[in-house]
């Protein structure tokens, strides 16, 4: 015979609930009207509870005691003559304690229909505001709203410290139309660990990290963490206003690429990472002193495998625990901005790893990735490729980009491995890939996503920089989207990098036969808005450091590297240099160790560091070195054909009254005296920089800081001069004038 309490459950619903098979729990648990609205019933499921009372949150008074339905923890009861729903808590007596628990099943859905539409359409820019774990206040009750996308799951629960990881305690509300699951939990503290427990259609259970978590545990653990309520108070208003009106393609951009875990370390044996406060105190002043305009951070999204350097992230929204929390990262970026240093972030949207707690087969199906491995797996890295054709996946990625730019005030994103996104046959043999709808090899869905991403980000965040690492000849990477381009602001010049490093590694006696390796880039320099990048990829995996690539004795190595940097800073295009290269690190980069800062005790390394600092200062002072980077009138060869001497000479021009600068770069150890060079005007010329100066550890061959032009036409110029060209050196000359303005932000 059924008890009165048992009649409050539908036929078999109590059994299904206990077995974890009743998915529509909100229709059963919580407060509901019965008897055609003439009474209220409260049902709850609390394992190990001995007694449960209903308490009014308004006045704290007891309203009713619930009856035990069974020993498993089901309780139910009517609330006397009350017929209007009210906010309540459950006073639960356990064997060892008594707790007041605000029942989460009394709250309705907190999802907005417009948010749901945009998320499904693929155009949501703020999906992190309703997905994941977000602090909310509902009817004066504060708590955390949990929400996850898992359309093919049979059941989803949120489990964590707050419910002893019991998957039956907080089963979530399912939205059949869009595949979202949600629940609002008042009794959750910041810093609480949690996961989503999913039951697949085949009955398997899997605990997954929150794809939208903004904080995660240290590896090898992988729980998500409820974020802090307090957010960093920003103080970078002046920077943000100036950034919004800056045309970066005309400004000086000298970027210092940093891997935070190995720039510098602390501890007796260098075993401890710097935290963000350490980086504020040491990295920012260093970058400022060296004259770089920006820091580019290698990925800081949470990643379990140190050896991936962050390029295989599992927590795309969670700053890695290694250096501090989200507020610490925000404080670092804020401090950079106050020091007038921009911050860019490497962002990985091309693929994701197969870690079982991550996105892989998230709800038992290929949700974020393609089902067919010919489109869904990356053969080079054994990772998975996002399904850009799915609206929810596009929203996940678009919202993530917006999250970093909006919440962290980042000044731009550098997209990793764009080439692998653009081509369906990337690193695949015939028969291992599927053509697009037109039979071609282009990944049309990825192309559409990149166009949409760049268009929306540039509209939403004025003054940002979107940068593509793209190594093929794909046309229009930096062309506007309305002209059919991808819409990036800049593209890494991988061709220049490969050619110039190949040239750098040749013995000087043979460089004359490969002269075009340094001149060829000017044949296509204006086809895209290129950025000259010497990144981390060029100093790892047995490639050696830049210094190690160069033949000859130590003097030749250091002299050649300085001359190479001079050529790079004079070449059209923005600049990027990986950390350690600015002082000629001898060993290739090792992510497990700090840079070899002890090398700065030696004069040759000090000389390279001073040279880079002075190059950056000159670069920022003279508009001719940046304002016409992407217009052909900003550059003119004086002599690009002197392969016999391996000497390169050219002029950089600005606009109007901007001072032109003449570069002469000698890539052999031969001293040239009485070497005639054309000059853009008459009068006195200043030898602004000479890489062979004793200030930089050179042999001090040069022109004593001054050159006088003669009225003798040469190399297409009306004037010329006889100069001394130092061995393996770079000269930068310009008309004697007052110091021009700083062209950086």
From Swiss-Prot:
Gene Ontology biological-process annotations: glycogen biosynthetic process
Keywords: Carbohydrate metabolism, Glycogen biosynthesis, Glycogen metabolism, Glycosyltransferase, Transferase
Cited CDD domains: AmyAc_Glg_BE, E_set_GBE_prok_N
Enzyme class (EC, first level): transferase
Signal peptide residues on this chain, from the entry's feature table: none
The protein's annotated pathway: Glycan biosynthesis; glycogen biosynthesis
Keyword Glycosyltransferase: yes
InterPro entries noted in UniProt: A-amylase/branching_C, Branching_enzy, GlgB, GlgB_N, GlgB_N_E_set_prok, Glyco_hydro_13_cat_dom, Glyco_hydro_13_N, Glyco_hydro_b
Catalytic activity annotation: Transfers a segment of a (1->4)-alpha-D-glucan chain to a primary hydroxy group in a similar glucan chain
Active site positions: 416, 469
GO cellular component: cytosol
EC number: 2.4.1.18
One MF annotation (Gene Ontology) recorded for this entry: hydrolase activity, hydrolyzing O-glycosyl compounds
HAMAP family reported in the protein's UniProt record: GlgB
Family: Belongs to the glycosyl hydrolase 13 family. GlgB subfamily.
Subunit structure: Monomer.
Protein name: 1,4-alpha-glucan branching enzyme GlgB
């Amino acid at each position: 015979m059924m008890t009165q309490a048992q009649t409050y459950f539908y036929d078999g619903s109590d059994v299904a609930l206990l077995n974890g098979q009743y998915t529509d729990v909100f229709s059963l648990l919580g407060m509901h009207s019965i008897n055609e609205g003439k009474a209220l019933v409260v049902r709850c499921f609390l394992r190990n509870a001995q007694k449960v009372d209903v308490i009014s949150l308004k006045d704290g008074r007891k309203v009713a005691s619930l009856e035990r339905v069974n020993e498993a923890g089901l309780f139910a009861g009517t609330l006397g003559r009350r017929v209007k729903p009210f906010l309540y808590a459950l006073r639960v007596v356990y064997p060892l304690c008594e707790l007041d628990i605000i029942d989460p099943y009394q709250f309705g859905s907190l999802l907005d229909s417009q948010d749901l539409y945009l998320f499904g359409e693929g155009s949501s820019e703020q999906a992190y505001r309703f997905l994941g774990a977000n602090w909310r206040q509902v009817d004066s009750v504060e708590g955390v709203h949990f929400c996850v996308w898992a359309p093919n799951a049979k059941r989803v629960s949120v489990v964590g410290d707050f419910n002893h990881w019991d998957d039956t305690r907080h089963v979530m509300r399912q939205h059949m139309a869009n595949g979202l699951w949600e629940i609002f939990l008042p009794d959750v503290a910041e810093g609480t660990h949690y996961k989503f427990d999913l039951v697949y259609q085949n009955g398997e259970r899997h605990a997954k990290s929150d794809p939208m978590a903004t904080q995660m545990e240290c590896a090898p653990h992988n729980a998500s963490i409820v974020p802090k309520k307090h957010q960093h108070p920003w103080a970078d208003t002046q920077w943000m206003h100036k950034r919004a009106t800056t045309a970066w393609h005309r400004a000086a951009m000298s970027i210092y690429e940093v891997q935070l875990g190995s720039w510098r370390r602390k501890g007796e044996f260098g075993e401890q990472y710097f935290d963000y406060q350490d980086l504020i105190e040491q990295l920012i002043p260093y970058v400022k002193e060296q004259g770089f305009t920006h820091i580019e951070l290698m990925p800081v999204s949470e990643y379990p495998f140190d050896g991936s350097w962050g390029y295989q992230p599992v927590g795309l929204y969670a700053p890695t625990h290694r250096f501090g929390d989200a507020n610490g990262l925000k404080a670092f970026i804020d401090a950079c901005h106050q020091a007038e240093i921009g911050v860019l972030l490497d962002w990985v949207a091309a693929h994701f790893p197969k870690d079982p707690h991550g996105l892989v087969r998230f709800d038992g199906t290929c949700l974020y990735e393609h089902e067919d491995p010919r489109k869904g797996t990356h053969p080079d890295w054994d990772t998975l490729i996002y399904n850009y054709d799915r609206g929810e996946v596009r929203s996940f990625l678009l919202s993530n980009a917006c999250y970093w730019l909006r919440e962290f005030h980042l000044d731009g994103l550098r997209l990793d491995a764009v080439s692998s996104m653009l081509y369906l046959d990337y690193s695949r043999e015939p028969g291992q890939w599927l053509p697009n709808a037109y039979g071609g090899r282009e990944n049309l869905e990825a192309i559409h996503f990149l166009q949409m991403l760049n268009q929306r980000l540039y509209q939403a965040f004025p003054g940002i920089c979107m940068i593509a690492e793209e190594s093929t000849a794909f046309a229009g990477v930096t062309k506007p989207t309305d002209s059919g381009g991808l819409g990036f602001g800049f593209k890494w010049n991988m061709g220049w990098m490969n050619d110039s490093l190949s040239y750098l590694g040749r013995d000087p006696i043979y460089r004359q036969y490969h002269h075009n390796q340094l001149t060829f880039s000017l044949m296509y320099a204006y086809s895209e808005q290129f950025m000259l990048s010497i990144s981390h990829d060029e100093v790892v995996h047995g490639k050696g450091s830049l210094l190690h690539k160069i033949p000859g004795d130590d003097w030749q190595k250091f002299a050649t590297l300085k001359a190479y940097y001079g050529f790079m800073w004079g070449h059209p295009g923005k600049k990027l240099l990986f950390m350690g290269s600015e002082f000629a690190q001898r060993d290739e980069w090792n992510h497990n160790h700090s840079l070899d800062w002890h090398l700065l005790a030696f004069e040759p390394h000090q000389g390279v560091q001073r040279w880079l600092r002075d190059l950056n200062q000159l670069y920022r002072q003279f508009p001719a070195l940046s304002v016409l980077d992407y217009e052909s009138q900003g550059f003119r060869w004086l002599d690009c054909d002197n392969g016999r001497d391996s000497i390169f000479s050219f002029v950089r021009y600005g606009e109007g009254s901007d001072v032109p600068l003449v570069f002469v770069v000698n890539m052999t150890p031969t001293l040239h005296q009485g070497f005639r060079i054309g000059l853009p005007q008459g009068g006195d010329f200043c030898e602004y920089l000479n890489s062979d100066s004793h200030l930089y550890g050179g042999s001090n061959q040069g022109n004593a800081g001054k050159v006088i032009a003669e009225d003798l036409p040469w190399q297409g110029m009306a004037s010329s001069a006889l100069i001394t060209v130092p061995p393996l050196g770079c000269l930068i000359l310009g008309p004697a004038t007052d110091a021009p303005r700083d062209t950086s932000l």
